[in-house]
Amino acid sequence: MKALLALGFLASWVAAGEHALRGECPADPLPCQELCTGDESCPQGHKCCSTGCGHACRGDIEGGRDGQCPRILVGLCIVQCMMDENCQSGERCCKSGCGRFCIPGLQPLQQLKDSNLTDGFNSKLEAQAP
């Protein structure tokens, strides 16, 4: 029975090896590291947060595009981009714990002044003014 089990394992290992590519996998661009020791060790406006396997400063990526990164992808260690330029137009490369994702940037409320809701509200205020 053990020999049959070992033979089955060996056959599956050989079959899996047939699909493997040559070469080595690249190093993880964001390995688990202690990149900060507290909020005071981070740039202004950033916090020292757990990545699940270390700590890193979290906040906007300096020098990036307009808009803020939403905080919905925490805990996923997938690196889809390294900087905003790796993303499509209108998207930001946002940190998420130990990963980075391309997602549309959130605009601050002041920048939403062209929306229909704001225009309608301003029209009502102007009509009520003496």
From Swiss-Prot:
Q: Which GO terms describe its molecular function?
A: serine-type endopeptidase inhibitor activity
Q: Indicate whether Repeat appears among the record's keywords.
A: yes
InterPro entries with a match to the protein in the record: Elafin-like_sf (IPR036645), WAP_dom (IPR008197), WAP_four-disulfide_core (IPR050514)
Q: Where is the signal peptide?
A: 1-16
Where does it reside?
A: Secreted
Q: What is its main location?
A: secreted
Work out whether the entry's keyword set contains Repeat: yes
**One GO cellular component from the entry?**
extracellular region
Provide an example Pfam family for this protein: WAP
Positions bearing carbohydrate: N116
- Which ranges carry the WAP domain? 17-61, 62-106
SS bond list: C25-C49, C32-C53, C36-C48, C42-C57, C69-C94, C77-C98, C81-C93, C87-C102
Q: Per UniProt, which keywords does this protein have?
A: Disulfide bond, Glycoprotein, Protease inhibitor, Repeat, Secreted, Serine protease inhibitor, Signal
State the name under which the record lists this protein: WAP four-disulfide core domain protein 3
Species, as recorded: Mus musculus
Lineage from the top down?
A: Eukaryota, Metazoa, Chordata, Craniata, Vertebrata
